[in-house]
């Protein structure tokens, strides 16, 4: 269970929809990016900067971000911890 995750430059994504955060340097991922562009499923959130991570969603959309994969992963962890804290408060009533 995740909330909205900041992927840079004021862009946020629904964390529950992301299935992978990967480094974009390999040839297969470059092909995946090109295929998504042809299919109209590429979302470029880099604001013209270098793509540092590719996020793959459960709807097969490919999201490009200028933020490092490790940074985005840390934001997922922080979001999960915050949601767990809120759920614990609710459980205690």
From Swiss-Prot:
Pfam families: RemA-like. InterPro entries: RemA-like. Belongs to the RemA family. PANTHER family: REGULATORY PROTEIN SSL2874-RELATED (PTHR38449:SF1), REGULATORY PROTEIN TM_1690-RELATED (PTHR38449). This is Putative regulatory protein Fnod_1678. It comes from Fervidobacterium nodosum (strain ATCC 35602 / DSM 5306 / Rt17-B1).
